Amino acid sequence: MKVAVLGAAGGIGQALALLLKTQLPADSKLSLYDIAPVTPGVAVDLSHIPTAVEVKGFAGQDPSPALEGADVVLISAGVARKPGMDRSDLFNINAGIVRNLVEKCAATCPKALIGIITNPVNTTVAIAAEVLKAAGVYDKNRLFGVTTLDVIRSETFVAEAKGLNVADVNVNVIGGHSGVTILPLLSQIEGVSFSDEEVAALTTRIQNAGTEVVEAKAGGGSATLSMGQAACRFGLSLVRGLQGEANVVECAYVDGGSEHAEFFAQPILLGKNGVEKVLAYGDVSEFEANARDAMLDTLNADIKLGVEFVK
């Protein structure tokens, strides 16, 4: 199993690479690429950790050597948020980066499962899809927007609020991966109940958690460590699905035939072909139904922006 991380010298990329080096199955290959010249050194640094995962690093303008034979590609390249920016401010820089990297994936590893971490995910996934379509290699079951950070934040915040063991908390988060498009389905959590005020406050905190980190870091960065953990969880789930493990389910932003939008985050069953099945997200409360319907204009505009960028 070969996993490639593009943007591996960045804050998310280094955290993700460290976690993958320690958690990928034995005899996996980990391939690190970044434009930054430090990248081969990141690989050497990681190679001193005693796990049966081979690490190689590649720097420069062309990621193709890192992508050869990749089964999974995780793309975290791009600029990070700074105070006062929202995820859409990142679009102008990150859109071109994602387009160029996905073009290389299409040419070098067209069958790989591609996880897009680079924000704004609502838009960059649509860009990736259009690039893959133009290359004639688009498979909707092999492209994912990584929204796992919204899931782990939801699970953490709910466990804190209710005094639960976080390992026992599972939360589906649907919609997209920015602001109002992030919708945790708190009504579905077994064994807990929330007041209307708690639901509103928790939902808002989950939606704005990225900003919470950006402001707390006082201009020194964004959510890199928690995002690295979230991306590792999702990447390992992709690997487990490819290896034939049963019942691997994660939420992700996919082209899954949703009635709501061309791309929509919801639970998916992972397998040897990527998405084996898009799962129904189940019954929702009145608050959740209203929030879902209210987000759709924003979400569809984000998607349209990505489609038009490529065309």
From Swiss-Prot:
EC number of the protein: 1.1.1.37
Cellular component terms (Gene Ontology): cytoplasm
Catalytic site positions: 177
Binding site for NAD(+): 7-13, 34, 94, 117-119, 227
Keywords recorded for this protein, A-Z: NAD, Oxidoreductase, Tricarboxylic acid cycle
Superkingdom of origin organism: Bacteria
Catalysed transformations (reactions): (S)-malate + NAD(+) = oxaloacetate + NADH + H(+)
UniProt GO MF annotations: L-malate dehydrogenase (NAD+) activity
N-terminal signal peptide: none
Pfam family, one: Ldh_1_N
Leading EC class: oxidoreductase
Listed InterPro entries: L-lactate/malate_DH, Lactate/malate_DH_C, Lactate/malate_DH_N, Lactate_DH/Glyco_Ohase_4_C, Malate_DH_AS, Malate_DH_type1, Malate_DH_type1_bac, NAD(P)-bd_dom_sf
Binding site for substrate: 81, 87, 119, 153
Keyword Kinase set for record: no
GO biological process assignments: malate metabolic process; tricarboxylic acid cycle
Role description: Catalyzes the reversible oxidation of malate to oxaloacetate.
Assembly information from the UniProt record: Homodimer.
Record family assignment: Belongs to the LDH/MDH superfamily. MDH type 1 family.
Protein name: Malate dehydrogenase
